């Protein structure tokens, strides 16, 4: 479990005494105490220690490590802990054993590193003095750079929630008996909560919580169990595995071809930018300042001047645009780069949605006229919309950002906005900005105006170029996962799935001869070869698992189509296709295999988009009175209102619609928005009887005259 998921889990279980602080990485109790002393707002507490021991075990048996949590001041002989679990002796567990069980280095392990996934693989021993402590306890929440402060009761509540009955040991009386803690008296059944999210009889390889009941945990499980990502040891950074990176490659391949049709060419600019250059455009740098990561030292030497790691590349690229653009004949200049950027300042990272480093493309173009720049802004916006609709099967709304939400330092920003049905939140999908002449004036990107008259100096007047920037990131992947996934796991549109169909041999029993088995499996391999030859990405699953296990595995990974082939199918000269989106079974004749499978994949792609669009459309509601605004939001809608399009009104709408924070919804500027923010001003405005009547229609937010219909919603 990641630190963020753990904190979310603790917030759900514990109503009081939960506080989390960040500090430098520590390696022992002394450095930990020192780090906390230099950290602000640390409550009074007792330090703890968490030790992982390896009990003496016969070679024929599986090692079950002991995880021991105690007060830092308690002496904890390993022999006593070993005796408590029925072993003769124990020693410190090697780092590889710790990482195998908990997935993190030993220095990061805390009692909360025990979870539902590994609880059955460990013995949990608690120091009696820790349980009896009157006050807060300090633990590492699976990261040595963070500390969570909780009560002893909270520790026991958490362990109970993951199915652990810890062994309590009084280390001050070595001869005393040890026993599992007594279960608490049974309480009256509580109202349904996220604790009710568990899916009964869920296989260990499958998703164990319902999407609609515990969305954060569901999302984390889907990403890890489907093999899309691996959590990294730096918070907010993630490893993209082939199952997710292939989606980015599909997007990259499609978009790269399309922008080249517009005359865009690829290049690459350095990762680093000097503070002098970064700070040249005031509004721009203020928009990114809290998120900029700085390199201040090389080895043991302090740098003379700190160097920023790019949060975006306007200030990296534009000094060289000024050098390269010397004449109107050099225009338009259209460059794109595929790279990663770093944006550091936030507390609640989410894979793909809010990460400290992310992959994206950023296009930067320079034009002779505003008209030319504006035309390109909308061309790119249309391409972004097609990525969502045609590849990811996700509906989006095209619009213009408000003044408050536009790109820092830009003239105007266009956007494609998505919708996550489970949470009722909007999500920004991609943006295409017209920067106007702001940056060209800062960086002196000028040409002679070819349409102006030659002046007394023999030269034509100078013209500052018009610029655009536009970007789309791996956030696209997270949006698709959230929109399409279900309680079984991922649900991938065929257009972007690494594996579009999987062939599974069926009907093999104990009575099946080796020859029959080989014939069935061999034919499955040939079916996969046929489909791959027809450019249908296919695998044959010949692993020594049951068909049921394979079905669950590929359903969880979201493969659009499963093809079953067994003795009965052989008799009928067919395969049985099973759609991931509907679980409908369709026989496909072998003599029409390639076309039959291709047609089914096309139907799946279309159905996934239409299903998502119908869900989205049902939750875009028009509201003309403020009294109806918040009730509409609370029904998981995004809301269209007649709006005056002023920043003051926008801020009041967000403030007045904010709701009480609970559960997984942390309250910080970059966290999922509690109040409704302006998502966009849709390019397609309501018409007919809903059209804005100038001088008559009132703003639903403030009562002044409305200018446009604005789309508002809680958002990521």
Curated annotation (Swiss-Prot):
PANTHER family: BIFUNCTIONAL GLUTAMATE_PROLINE--TRNA LIGASE, PROLYL-TRNA SYNTHETASE. The keyword Hydrolase does not apply. InterPro entries: aa-tRNA-synt_IIb, aa-tRNA-synth_II, aa-tRNA-synth_II/BPL/LPL, Anticodon-bd, Anticodon-bd_dom_sf, Pro-tRNA-ligase_IIa, Pro-tRNA-ligase_IIa_arc-type, Pro-tRNA_ligase_II_C. Belongs to the class-II aminoacyl-tRNA synthetase family. GO terms for cellular component: aminoacyl-tRNA synthetase multienzyme complex; cytoplasm; cytosol. One of its GO terms (molecular function) is Cys-tRNA(Pro) deacylase activity. GO terms for biological process: cytoplasmic translation; prolyl-tRNA aminoacylation. It comes from Schizosaccharomyces pombe (strain 972 / ATCC 24843). This is Putative proline--tRNA ligase C19C7.06. Keywords: Aminoacyl-tRNA synthetase, ATP-binding, Cytoplasm, Ligase, Nucleotide-binding, Protein biosynthesis. It is found in: Cytoplasm. The gene is prs1. It comes from the Eukaryota. It catalyses: tRNA(Pro) + L-proline + ATP = L-prolyl-tRNA(Pro) + AMP + diphosphate. NCBIfam families: proS_fam_I. Its EC number is 6.1.1.15. HAMAP family: Pro_tRNA_synth_type3 (MF_01571). Residues 655-675 are annotated as: Disordered.
């Amino acid at each position: 479990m990641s630190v963020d998921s753990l904190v979310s889990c603790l917030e759900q279980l514990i109503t009081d005494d939960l506080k989390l602080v960040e500090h430098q990485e520590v390696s022992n109790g002394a450095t930990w105490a020192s780090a906390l002393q230099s950290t602000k707002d640390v409550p009074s507490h007792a330090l703890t220690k968490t030790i992982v021991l390896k009990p003496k075990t016969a070679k024929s048996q599986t090692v079950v490590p002991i995880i021991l949590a105690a007060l830092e001041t308690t002496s904890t002989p390993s022999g006593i802990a070993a005796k408590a679990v029925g072993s003769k002796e124990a020693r410190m567990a090697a780092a590889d054993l710790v990482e195998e069980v908990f997935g993190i280095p030993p220095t990061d392990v805390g009692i909360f590193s025990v979870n539902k996934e590994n609880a059955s693989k460990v013995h949990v021993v608690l120091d009696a003095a820790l349980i009896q402590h009157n006050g807060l306890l300090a633990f590492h929440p699976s990261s040595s750079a963070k500390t969570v402060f909780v009560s002893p009761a909270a520790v026991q509540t958490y362990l109970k929630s993951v199915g652990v009955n810890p062994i309590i040991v009084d280390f001050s009386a070595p001869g005393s008996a040890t026993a599992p803690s007594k279960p608490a008296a049974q309480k009256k059944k509580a109202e349904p909560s996220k604790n009710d999210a568990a899916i009964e009889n869920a296989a260990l390889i499958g998703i164990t919580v319902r999407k609609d009941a515990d969305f954060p945990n569901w999302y984390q499980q889907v990403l890890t169990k489907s093999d899309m990502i691996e959590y990294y040891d730096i918070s907010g950074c993630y490893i993209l595995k082939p199952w997710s990176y292939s989606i980015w490659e599909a997007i990259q391949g499609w978009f790269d071809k399309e922008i080249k049709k517009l005359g865009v060419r690829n290049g690459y600019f350095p990762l680093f930018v000097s503070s002098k250059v970064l700070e040249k455009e005031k509004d721009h740098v203020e928009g990114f300042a809290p998120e900029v990561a700085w390199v201040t030292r090389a080895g043991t030497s302090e740098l003379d001047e700190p160097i920023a790691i790019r949060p975006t590349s306007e200030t990296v690229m534009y000094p060289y645009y000024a050098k390269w653009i010397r004449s109107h004949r050099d225009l338009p200049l259209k460059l794109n780069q595929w790279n990663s950027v770093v944006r550091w300042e936030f507390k609640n990272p989410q894979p793909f949605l809010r990460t400290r480093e992310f992959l994206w493309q950023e296009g930067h173009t320079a034009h002779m006229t505003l008209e030319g720049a504006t035309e390109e802004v909308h061309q790119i916006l249309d391409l972004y919309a097609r990525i969502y609709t045609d590849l990811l099967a996700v509906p989006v709304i095209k619009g213009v950002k408000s003044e408050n939400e536009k790109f820092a330092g830009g003239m105007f920003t266009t956007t494609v906005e998505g919708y996550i049905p489970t949470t009722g939140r909007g999500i920004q999908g991609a943006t295409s900005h017209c920067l106007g002449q702001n940056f060209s004036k800062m960086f002196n990107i000028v040409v002679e105006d070819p349409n102006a008259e030659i002046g007394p100096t023999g030269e034509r007047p100078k013209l500052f170029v018009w610029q655009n920037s536009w970007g789309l990131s791996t956030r696209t992947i997270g949006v698709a996962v959230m929109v399409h996934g279900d309680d079984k796991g991922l649900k991938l549109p065929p257009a972007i799935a690494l594996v579009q169909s999987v062939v599974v041999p069926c009907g093999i029993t104990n009575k099946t001869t080796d020859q029959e088995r080989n014939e069935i499996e061999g034919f499955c391999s040939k079916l996969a070869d046929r489909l791959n030859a027809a450019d249908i990405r296919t695998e044959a699953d010949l692993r020594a698992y049951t068909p049921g296990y394979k079905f669950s595995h590929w359903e969880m990974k979201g493969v659009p189509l499963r093809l079953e082939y067994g003795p009965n199918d052989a008799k009928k000269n067919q395969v049985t296709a099973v759609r991931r989106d509907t679980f409908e079974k369709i026989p496909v004749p072998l003599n029409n295999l390639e076309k039959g499978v291709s047609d089914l994949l096309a139907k799946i792609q279309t159905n996934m988009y239409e299903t998502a669009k119908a869900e989205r459309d049902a939750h875009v509601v028009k509201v003309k009175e403020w009294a109806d605004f918040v009730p509409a939001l609370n029904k998981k809608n995004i809301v269209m209102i007649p709006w005056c399009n002023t920043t003051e009104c926008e801020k009041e709408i967000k403030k007045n619609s904010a709701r009480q924070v609970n559960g997984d919804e942390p309250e910080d500027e970059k966290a999922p928005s509690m109040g409704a923010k302006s998502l966009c001003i849709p390019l397609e405005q309501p018409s007919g009887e809903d059209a804005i009547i100038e001088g008559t229609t009132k703003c639903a937010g403030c009562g002044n005259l409305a200018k446009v219909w604005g789309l508002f919603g809680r958002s990521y």
